[in-house]
From Swiss-Prot:
Keywords: Ribonucleoprotein, Ribosomal protein. GO terms for cellular component: cytosolic small ribosomal subunit. The lineage of its organism: Bacteria, Bacillati, Actinomycetota, Actinomycetes, Propionibacteriales. The keyword Lyase does not apply. GO terms for molecular function: structural constituent of ribosome. Residues 229-283 are annotated as: Disordered. The keyword Secreted does not apply. Residues 246-283 have a biased composition (Basic and acidic residues). This is Small ribosomal subunit protein uS2. One of its GO terms (biological process) is translation. Belongs to the universal ribosomal protein uS2 family. CDD domains: RPS2. InterPro entries: Ribosomal_uS2 (IPR001865), Ribosomal_uS2_bac/mit/plastid (IPR005706), Ribosomal_uS2_flav_dom_sf (IPR023591).
Length: 283
């Protein structure tokens, strides 16, 4: 079954690029035609690249990897949160903080601080030993950290891949991922540089419907990878048989000895019966 159809891409406006005066010549091979001063993206190529990106994300997640969803522009914020949360993946939809990947050790300390503040009860002034002003300042600190780092609070280490909406706007995320050799999966509009991306999807990164559709496809790939991972875990480690208690082993061994003895009795009787006629003949 196809991941997505050409009709779905058309209905979501994935084929609309930027104005012809705002383009990157490196994207020429992905452009189908020009219409009314706007480039039209070749959706047949988009379908092919979607399949490649889908397979990569699925395999990465199936092997235990995480995909970081990144999209801070207004058109992407809602779908980034919705789809990443649906499949339990980390996300950044407000602001990319410098060093989120390349200086993750420091970011981890800020995440620990966020969790520390979340554990505090800001309504109990008397029991906290702090003034109202101090509690207010701590509450504001928590809100700021939640806004900036809430999406990656459960990300234990740098991700194994990054999904990016609008590579030009998220150039900091792209740069950090490339420094760490983290594969980048991204929508490539006609003004983008395809050399910055490992798994490109030629498409419209400005329209809400286009961004939502493509982000959902990547989330679906992650969901399928999670199912494959779960199935692999259940199949790889079969439950070991419990060791047999000593009393049960002795009982079975005793029964076995009795069975062997009973089996020998008919043989002995048959041997005696055979020996009897021989004795009569000799007499």
């Amino acid at each position: 079954m196809a991941v997505v159809t050409t009709r779905q891409l058309l209905e979501s406006g994935v084929h609309f690029g930027h104005q012809t005066r705002r383009w990157n010549p490196k994207m020429k091979r992905f452009i189908f035609t020009e219409r009314n001063g706007i480039y039209i993206i070749d959706l047949h190529q988009s379908l092919t690249y979607i399949d490649k990106a889908y397979a990569f994300v699925k395999e990465t997640v199936a092997k235990g990897g995480q995909i970081l969803f990144v999209g801070t522009k207004k058109q992407a914020q809602e779908s980034i949160v919705e789809q990443a949360t649906r499949v339990g993946m980390p996300y950044v939809n407000q602001r990319w903080l410098g060093g989120m990947l390349t200086n993750f050790q420091t970011i981890s300390k800020r995440i620990a601080r966020l969790k520390e503040l979340e554990a505090m009860d800001f309504d109990k002034v008397s029991g906290s030993g702090l003034t109202k002003k101090e509690l207010l300042m701590l509450s504001r600190e928590k809100d700021k950290l939640e806004k900036d780092l809430g999406g990656i609070r459960d990300m234990p280490k740098v991700p194994q891949a990054v999904w990016v909406v609008d590579t030009k706007k998220e150039h900091l995320a792209i740069d950090e991922a490339r420094k760490l050799k983290i594969p980048v999966v991204a929508i490539l509009d006609t003004n983008c540089d395809p050399d910055e991306v490992d798994y490109a999807i030629p498409g419209n990164d400005d329209a809400i419907r286009s961004v939502s559709l493509l982000t959902r496809i990547i989330a679906d790939a992650a969901a399928e990878g999670l199912m494959a991972r779960s199935a692999g875990k259940s199949g790889e480690q079969p439950a070991e048989a419990e060791p047999m208690p000593d009393w049960e082993r002795e009982l079975l061994e005793g029964d076995g000895a009795k069975t062997e003895a009973k089996a020998e009795e008919p043989k002995a009787e048959a041997k005696k019966a055979d020996e009897a006629p021989e004795a009569e003949k000799s007499n």
